[in-house]
Design a protein with these regions (language model features):
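Surface-exposed, charge/polar-rich loops and edge strands
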Residues: 1-221
Length: 221
């Protein structure tokens, strides 16, 4: 069972380190731990409120545990991972955007899949939908008449999101509290600001929240 380096003596039930919606194939070197908070009952309750789930796939590489050692984080080389975004997911994103709803990613792996599937050169599928991609963002891909999420079959990504990066698809994120100097910390600091993330972590420490894989989660809006 693939475990992060800070878990060296786990003797619990392997099923406790697996999401309820995981595929049976063994491709990933780590579990998408934000999803460990979800049970079938919780997902049913969320859907009863009107939310819809759509599944993406990303084969997490072992380098997900590798910390950013460079003094200049822009020099860090991101590992390559394989991912899949189906037509069903693309349609779900379009529907959510068209109806004015948020696309909420569960975990950083879902973020990397969805944002990797955004093609800045793709023709606009629906101006009303694509305009939502850049709402409140500086680059505004839709103003050029292009930019859309597209189907990705068996694709690869080295997407490295860090402060200053633009999110095109994801509006909000459910994620755990991450290890310092990790690419995951960079990713969440790109969706919020670094100061907001540091404030959230300080509050979590004060309230004695649990960190890392089996820890608590945060919602970034």
């Amino acid at each position: 069972m693939p475990l992060p380096p800070y878990i060296t003596d786990y003797e619990g039930d392997p099923e406790k380190y697996q999401t309820v919606y995981a595929m049976k194939e063994e491709h990933s070197a780590a579990a998408p731990t934000a999803g460990l908070h979800f049970t079938p009952e919780l997902m049913a309750a969320i859907e009863a409120k009107g939310a819809k789930f759509a599944a993406v796939e990303l084969e997490v590489g072992i380098d997900t545990f590798r910390l950013v050692e460079e003094d200049d984080p822009t020099q860090h080389v991101m590992h390559t991972e394989r991912y899949h975004v189906s037509q069903e997911v693309v349609d779900a994103v379009h529907k959510a955007k068209a109806e004015g709803h948020r696309v909420i990613a569960v975990g950083t792996t879902a973020v990397r899949s969805l944002e990797s599937a955004f093609d800045a050169e793709a023709p606009v599928s629906d101006p009303a939908v694509t305009a939502r991609y850049s709402e409140g963002r500086e680059d505004g891909a839709d103003t050029l008449g292009r930019g859309d999420i597209v189907v990705r079959e068996n694709a690869t990504t080295q997407l490295y999101l860090m402060p200053g990066s633009t999110y095109h698809v994801v509006d909000a994120l459910i994620t755990n509290f991450h290890v310092p100097r990790s690419t995951l910390m960079m990713l969440v600091s790109a969706l919020a600001t670094r100061d907001q993330i540091m404030d959230a972590y300080a509050a979590a420490i004060e309230e004695r929240y649990r960190f890392f894989s089996f820890g608590d989660a945060m919602l970034i809006l």
